[in-house]
């Protein structure tokens, strides 16, 4: 059965799957089916933590809020254009259209605010699960061209160009209903953003997918900068663990990367919070730091096999050169300005997972494109949960002290 949509709930204790014939809800630890209905072609499903309330998109423009325990419909809403994403926490319901975002009070379903955005066909948006730090993040809208704008002579007649999503993130306080900051995260357009469970950190990736950055929220100070690799790749999913010590990232390379967030690795020293909302553009963010076009070794794709030869002469030479390089960078970096020293010390993944090759079974989607995946980390054990577009659910164990390659411990399909 084809999967239309798959997502974890806010604390990763449940997994929800939307299909062409209803939806299913599973517990993640242990993995077991919790609820199933075979009615309706469900395009999108979102849960509210572990409650019986779910938000469903039944047709392109129609939202239905359902109580699965009572098997009743709480309300239905119809929107002017296709609903591309739904986000919710205990205070707010967020509906994302291509060029609008609707904010609702989830208790009363009263419309609180409508945000006009630039075209956002990928529905890049993140809502904090926290009721206190109830922040919404989305790409900063582009300024509209002046009415007197004249297209260049070489432009085709009637040609209209829609600018791509910006690389800047707007932070919106959904309780105060006001924009509070803009984070200039990337030079390239955004591809993926996510907030941690406390609403105090945001991770960003651009459409090149080589650099992952983590900023504090709401002040927008850059705390970490990670290199996924040098080969451009589409980032499909990013997820913090509940303690915000690890960041898990999946992409079109079929390699899952885990980055460690520790105080010693922070690329920023302690900075005072701004006294008023402002555009956050630290020199470490864009102007003096390496960006997506920087070249470096990559552990993905064809180069991944090099990990398996660490006992060979080449492996020893590689480790030696890396050790010398890191030591040299640490010494030299101490004499350089902060923005320059970052170029010497790109932070790599702490651990990684290679997804097994598999053919989609009867429950897979049969797509021939890149294997898409959604990732989350277990609350109780050092494990990474991965759901793939071919209908598989994997659980990998991670060594939190040594890192390295994760071990597949469970698989369901």
Swiss-Prot record:
WD repeats lie at residues 1-36, 69-114, 141-182, 185-225, 230-269, 308-354, 366-406. GO terms for cellular component: endosome membrane; phagophore assembly site membrane; vacuolar membrane. A motif (L/FRRG motif) lies at residues 226-230. It is found in: Preautophagosomal structure membrane; Vacuole membrane; Endosome membrane. SUPFAM superfamilies: WD40 repeat-like. Residues 263-289 have a biased composition (Low complexity). Keywords: Autophagy, Endosome, Membrane, Protein transport, Repeat, Transport, Vacuole, WD repeat. It comes from the Eukaryota. The PI(3,5)P2 regulatory complex regulates both the synthesis and turnover of phosphatidylinositol 3,5-bisphosphate (PtdIns(3,5)P2). Necessary for proper vacuole morphology. Plays an important role in osmotically-induced vacuole fragmentation. Required for cytoplasm to vacuole transport (Cvt) vesicle formation, pexophagy and starvation-induced autophagy. Involved in correct atg9 trafficking to the pre-autophagosomal structure. Might also be involved in premeiotic DNA replication. The N-terminus might form a beta-propeller domain involved in specific binding to phosphatidylinositol 3,5-bisphosphate (PIP2), leading to the association of the protein to the membrane. The L/FRRG motif is essential for the cytoplasm to vacuole transport (Cvt) pathway, for the recruitment of atg8 and atg16 to the PAS in nutrient-rich medium, and for its recruitment to and dissociation from the PAS under starvation conditions. Component of the PI(3,5)P2 regulatory complex. Belongs to the WD repeat PROPPIN family. This is Autophagy-related protein 18. It comes from Aspergillus oryzae (strain ATCC 42149 / RIB 40) (Yellow koji mold). The gene is atg18.
């Amino acid at each position: 059965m084809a999967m239309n949509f798959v997502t974890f709930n806010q604390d990763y204790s449940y997994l929800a799957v939307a299909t062409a014939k209803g939806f299913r809800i599973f517990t993640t630890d242990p993995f077991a089916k919790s609820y199933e209905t075979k009615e309706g072609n469900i395009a999108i499903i979102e849960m509210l933590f572990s409650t019986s309330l779910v938000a469903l998109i039944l047709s392109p423009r129609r939202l239905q809020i359902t109580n699965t325990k009572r098997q009743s419909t709480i309300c239905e809403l119809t929107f002017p254009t296709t609903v591309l994403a739904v986000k919710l926490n205990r205070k707010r319901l967020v509906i994302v259209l291509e060029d609008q975002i609707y904010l609702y009070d989830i208790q009363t379903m009263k419309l609180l605010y409508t945000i006009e955005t630039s075209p956002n066909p990928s529905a890049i948006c993140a809502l904090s699960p926290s009721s206190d730090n109830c922040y919404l993040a989305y790409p900063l809208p582009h300024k509209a061209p002046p009415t007197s704008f004249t297209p260049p002579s070489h432009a085709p007649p009637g040609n209209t160009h829609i600018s791509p999503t910006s690389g800047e993130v707007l932070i919106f306080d959904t309780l105060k209903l006001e924009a509070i900051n803009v984070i200039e995260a990337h030079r390239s357009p955004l591809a993926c953003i996510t907030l941690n469970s406390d609403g105090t950190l945001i991770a960003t990736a651009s459409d090149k997918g080589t650099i992952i950055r983590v900023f504090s929220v709401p002040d927008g100070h850059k705390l970490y900068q990670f290199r996924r690799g040098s080969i451009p790749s589409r980032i499909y999913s990013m997820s913090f663990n509940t303690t915000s010590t690890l960041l898990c990232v999946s992409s079109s390379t079929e390699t899952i990367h885990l980055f460690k967030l520790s105080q010693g690795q922070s690329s920023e020293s302690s900075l005072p919070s701004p006294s008023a909302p402002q555009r956050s553009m630290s020199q470490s963010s864009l102007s003096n730091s390496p960006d997506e076009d920087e070249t470096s070794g990559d552990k993905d794709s064809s180069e991944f096999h090099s990990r398996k030869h660490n006992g060979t002469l080449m492996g020893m030479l590689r480790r030696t050169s890396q050790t010398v390089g890191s030591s040299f960078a640490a010494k030299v970096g101490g004499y350089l300005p902060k923005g320059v020293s970052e170029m010497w010390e790109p932070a790599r993944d702490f651990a990684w997972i290679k997804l097994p090759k598999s053919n989609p079974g009867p429950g897979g989607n049969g797509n021939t494109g890149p294997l898409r995946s959604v990732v989350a980390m277990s609350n109780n054990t050092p494990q990474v949960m991965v759901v793939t577009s071919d209908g598989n659910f994997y659980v990998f164990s991670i060594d939190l002290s040594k890192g390295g390659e994760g071990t597949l411990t469970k698989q369901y399909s």
